[in-house]
């Protein structure tokens, strides 16, 4: 019945129809439920029914474990901090002055010390969902606008860009900054260069980089990671950068942060970056379906392990980051998220198999170098991936030229 309705109204959106200019929106909605009706005129090159939309939706689903854990963790961190700082009437006053808090209680949750998993998820959702909705609406507007101007269908890559961007920002990010960031990512880093398939930079990371340099106070520092009014606490990566492994403590309880705490995600940070375990679950899904390249992931790990081990051997009495072992680099900051979901972006990464190895190795090595050597910015994954994006075409060019020369030497005579 739904398919018949879609087919009955299709002629209104085709060239000459009364809704011709809205074809991009119609096509996006129709292909959300059914595969396109287009067929090839000559020998078909289609191997199966999985198209771009299905691939992007699978990536969208793959980040759900990290997204749900991120909402739970953001809410849990905020509730613990609030109950640590306030009590009684003072806590009630704080709740009444923040719409996230009173909305959580209005929906049946609680901000008190007795809060359960549901209340933590609910509070985290009041922070994440508005950011995601803002990013989706604003970014979707630009996507549809460019599609209407260029007269082609809406590219499904924005489904992934929108949720990835929303997951790599702090839960306290102002909504207007989220709108600015995704605007920069979609318009400047993607559409100006031709749209999906033609951008050489990762749009989500480009948008975050714009916010980092334009509004550093809302995207970094000690006050943006825990959604509790009046609370300040550094991320685990910043703690290590300033005091080594001994400085890793829970900002609320003062208890030491263990490797397992960081691996599971019981630490403050960007919404989707805190749980390496949840990220691994999603990554296993897209690697199994061959959407993400295992070569890139392996290359990132090789580069990270090699350079971090080198710094461990060199050592330093003044810079604690020299002594961070590779297994801590893996679980702190945005390394795991970047390795699994950003570095493997098929558009901005290298295409050739050999190029993927070198592309991944460069990312892992650059991430550790930025973390260790840069005194002002302990995180390095974002800049490392954007830097490697610039070199991805060069890697492919070198690999292709080398293959051509080898074949000419073999068969040219």
Swiss-Prot record:
Domain of life: Bacteria
Subcellular location, record wording: Cell inner membrane
Transmembrane segments: 55-75, 128-148, 163-183, 267-287, 296-316, 324-344, 357-377, 380-400
Membrane topology annotation: Multi-pass membrane protein
Keyword list, A-Z: Cell inner membrane, Cell membrane, Flavoprotein, FMN, Ion transport, Membrane, NAD, Phosphoprotein, Sodium, Sodium transport, Translocase, Transmembrane, Transmembrane helix, Transport, Ubiquinone
Pfam families given in the database record: NQR2_RnfD_RnfE (PF03116)
GO CC term, one of those recorded: plasma membrane
Biological processes per GO annotation: respiratory electron transport chain; sodium ion transport; transmembrane transport
Family: Belongs to the NqrB/RnfD family.
Record protein name field: Na(+)-translocating NADH-quinone reductase subunit B
């Amino acid at each position: 019945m739904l398919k018949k309705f879609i087919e009955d109204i299709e002629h209104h959106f085709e060239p000459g129809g009364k809704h011709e200019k809205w074809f991009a929106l119609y096509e996006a909605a129709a292909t959300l439920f059914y595969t396109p009706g287009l067929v090839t005129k000559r020998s078909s090159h289609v191997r199966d029914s999985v198209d771009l939309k299905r691939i992007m939706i699978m990536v969208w689903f793959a980040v759900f474990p990290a997204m749900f854990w991120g909402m739970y963790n953001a809410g849990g961190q905020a509730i613990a901090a609030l109950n640590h700082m306030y009590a009684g009437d003072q806590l009630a006053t704080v709740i009444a002055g923040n719409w996230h808090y009173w909305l959580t209680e209005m929906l049946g949750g609680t901000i008190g010390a007795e809060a359960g998993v549901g209340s933590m998820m609910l509070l985290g959702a009041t922070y994440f969902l508005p950011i995601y909705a803002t990013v989706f609406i604003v970014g979707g507007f630009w996507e549809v606008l460019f599609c209407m101007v260029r007269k082609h269908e809406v590219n499904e890559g924005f489904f992934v860009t929108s949720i990835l961007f929303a997951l790599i920002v702090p839960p306290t990010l102002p909504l207007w900054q989220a709108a600015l960031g995704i605007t920069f990512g979609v318009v400047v880093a993607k559409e100006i260069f031709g749209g999906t398939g033609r951008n050489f930079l990762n749009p989500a990371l480009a948008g975050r980089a714009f916010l980092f340099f334009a509004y550093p106070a809302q995207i970094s520092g000690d006050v943006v990671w825990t959604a509790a009014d009046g609370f300040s606490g550094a991320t685990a990566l910043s703690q290590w950068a300033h005091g080594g492994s001994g400085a890793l403590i829970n900002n609320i309880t003062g208890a030491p942060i263990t490797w397992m705490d960081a691996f599971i995600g019981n630490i403050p940070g960007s919404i989707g970056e805190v749980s390496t375990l949840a990220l691994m679950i999603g990554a296993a899904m897209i690697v199994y379906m061959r959407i993400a390249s295992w070569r890139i992931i392996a290359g990132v790990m090789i580069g990270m392990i090699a350079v971090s081990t080198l710094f461990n051997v060199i050592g330093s009495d003044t810079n604690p980051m020299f002594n961070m072992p590779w297994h801590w680099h893996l679980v702190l900051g945005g390394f795991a998220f970047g390795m699994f979901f950003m570095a493997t972006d098929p558009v901005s990464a290298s295409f050739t198999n050999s190029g993927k190895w070198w592309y991944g190795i460069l990312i892992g090595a650059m991430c550790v170098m930025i973390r260790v050597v840069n005194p002002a910015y302990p995180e390095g994954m974002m800049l490392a991936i954007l830097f490697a994006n610039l070199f991805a075409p060069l890697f492919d060019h070198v690999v292709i030229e080398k293959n051509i020369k080898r074949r000419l030497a073999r068969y040219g005579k």
